[in-house]
């Protein structure tokens, strides 16, 4: 059963007919009144063409969505049973009718030389008093320069200067025998030297500085450098840079070695995926108060993670940058432009996101079909399995659907480390004969690369990280915003999914052994962060729509709303805001502090 426009434009009908292809199926085809008659000559099966009565022609998904958003009755537009299902599960709230097309960001990292005129102009803006001396120092040291540019005009927003050193070059570059000896004793391999971070003062200074630091650090990690040191160029030092480096885990070297240097061990970094902004629906996701709350929460979590393994690198990876670079690689692999063409020109491959990345979006000029997978825990957290996301077809059927497109698949995910999702999908892909052209991920670890070689897949990551100590996905730490699904026979109403966040008071942290006080502090940080973000969302929602953002309407603000599982006998009041429940959880968590001392009032 299809519309006449599908027969006219869908690529499956434009392919040559073959055994078991869609051309041999019997068809019921609906044609709108007044539409140009379509050519059904490609269909060898029986064709029955129908047109709808005029009163039904007025019914459209657009009208239904508008009525749902306005909380109006839709019984005259849709079957009452379907209406009840839509309202019970809070479907279509603030949802676009069509999947949004993923767009490339306008940020670009460009290496350049110290004599580049763009660098000189930037230094005069960010350090006007010492610009010339800095240029002279860069000329003497020969450090590499990385520019952060914006837009087609490549406006320079910031720059980082660095040098990758072997042990025999430490003294010649650092100019201090004590500092060279300190690095040689602690590095255990090649060393990255950060000599400068130049970003003009602005509200975005910290964000742009973080992007530059991440780019330089991941560049060094990909080359298997094991240690990093910050020693500013002569005559250049800035307090905000030291604060940014502190959030990456850098610590001061002993005072007898150097008064200005900071250092960090990069052998087993702690990875933090900065993705909360991708879980919030527009227009709330771009509201200044929400953006500020998300940014403040991220920096607070970064600070907290530096206490887990003092002196080890805490690497923050921006989901926005990963999206941008994955888009470039997907379209390049598919041989199509990065910007949607008109008319659309599809490449030969199909993009298949199989994790939490790129859900509900379309890659430009590329057939995009998401494999809806979910990590589902047993109620006691004793085990979990990779299954189909609730209300979606079983994984076997989803894979067969992918195979039916008869296109080589580009599998996409945010991370490939232990590979639990791809291990679950691999037998299904092989059983159906689905061709996997490439596996593209946000970051690929050494363990993940070994797994892909053993399975015979060609895998590539935006970032390559040989080792990691721990990895955190920020959204999964935030109650009501993210988490992992809990298996329950009955789901809560309001479109909420029972879930668990692996922090107190919902569960014991799953990360490598933490002392009780650190585990408690990390948990408090995460729950308070979620509360602050939800408060900002509730305030902005009230301002924009003149009503409260309650649990029953949380799906208007959060793409995949979840609720912390409290057991089968506990139910949420859907008329309350999510932040009020987190206030209660924070109070409960404060009762659980280890070694808490009572005070007399």
What are the language-model segments listed below?
Residues 175-179, 191-199, 204-222, 418-427:
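Conserved acetyl-CoA-binding loop-helix of GNAT-fold acetyltransferases
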């Amino acid at each position: 059963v299809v519309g006449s426009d599908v027969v006219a434009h869908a690529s499956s009908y434009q392919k040559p007919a073959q055994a078991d292809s869609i051309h041999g199926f019997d068809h019921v085809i609906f044609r709108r009144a007044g539409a140009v008659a379509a050519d059904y000559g490609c269909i060898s099966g029986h064709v029955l063409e129908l047109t709808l009565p005029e009163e039904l022609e007025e019914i459209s998904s657009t009208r239904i969505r508008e009525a749902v958003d306005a909380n109006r009755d839709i019984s005259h537009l849709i079957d009452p049973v379907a209406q009840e299902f839509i309202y019970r599960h809070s479907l279509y709230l603030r949802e676009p009718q069509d999947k949004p097309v993923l767009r490339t960001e306008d940020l670009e990292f460009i290496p350049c030389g110290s004599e580049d005129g763009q660098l000189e102009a930037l230094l005069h803006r960010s350090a006007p008093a010492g610009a010339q001396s800095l240029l002279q120092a860069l000329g003497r040291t020969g450090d590499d320069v990385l520019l952060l540019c914006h837009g087609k005009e490549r406006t320079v927003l910031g720059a980082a200067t660095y040098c990758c050193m072997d042990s025999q070059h430490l003294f010649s570059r650092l100019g201090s025998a004590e500092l060279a000896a300190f690095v040689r004793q602690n590095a255990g391999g090649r060393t990255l030297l950060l000599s400068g971070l130049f970003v003009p003062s602005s509200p975005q200074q910290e964000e742009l500085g973080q992007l530059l630091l991440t780019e330089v650090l991941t560049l060094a990690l990909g080359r298997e450098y094991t240690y990093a040191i910050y020693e500013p160029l002569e005559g250049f030092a800035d307090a905000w840079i030291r604060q940014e480096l502190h959030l990456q885990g850098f610590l001061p070297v002993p005072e007898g070695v150097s008064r200005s240097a900071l250092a960090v061990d990069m052998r087993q970094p702690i990875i933090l995926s900065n993705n909360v902004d991708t879980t919030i629906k527009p227009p709330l996701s771009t509201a200044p108060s929400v953006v500020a709350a998300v940014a403040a929460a991220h920096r607070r979590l970064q600070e907290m993670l530096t206490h887990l393994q003092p002196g080890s690198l805490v690497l923050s990876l921006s989901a926005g940058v990963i999206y941008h670079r994955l888009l470039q690689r997907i379209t390049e692999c598919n041989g199509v432009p990065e910007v949607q063409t008109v008319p659309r020109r599809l490449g030969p491959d199909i993009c298949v996101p199989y994790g939490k990345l790129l859900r509900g979006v379309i890659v430009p000029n590329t057939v995009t079909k998401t494999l809806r997978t979910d990590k589902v825990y047993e109620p006691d957290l004793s085990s979990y399995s990779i299954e189909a996301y609730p209300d979606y077809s079983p994984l076997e059927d989803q894979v067969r659907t992918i195979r039916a497109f008869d296109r080589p698949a580009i599998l996409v995910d945010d991370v490939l480390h232990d590979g639990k999702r791809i291990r679950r999908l691999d037998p299904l892909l092989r059983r159906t004969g689905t061709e996997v052209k490439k596996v593209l991920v946000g970051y690929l670890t050494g363990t993940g690369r070994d797994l892909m070689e053993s399975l015979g897949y060609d895998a590539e990551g935006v970032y390559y990280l040989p080792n990691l100590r721990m990895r955190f996905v920020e959204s999964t730490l935030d109650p009501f915003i993210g988490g992992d699904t809990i298996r329950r026979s009955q789901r809560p109403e309001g479109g909420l999914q029972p879930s668990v966040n692996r922090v107190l008071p919902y569960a014991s942290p799953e990360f490598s052994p933490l002392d009780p006080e650190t585990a408690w502090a990390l948990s408090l940080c995460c729950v308070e962060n979620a509360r602050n973000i939800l408060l900002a969302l509730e305030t902005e929602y009230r301002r924009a729509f003149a009503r409260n953002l309650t649990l029953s309407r949380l799906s208007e603000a959060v793409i995949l709303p979840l609720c912390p599982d409290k057991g089968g006998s506990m139910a949420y009041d859907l008329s309350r805001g999510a932040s009020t429940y987190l206030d209660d959880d924070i109070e409960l968590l404060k009762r659980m502090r280890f070694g808490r001392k009572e005070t007399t009032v």
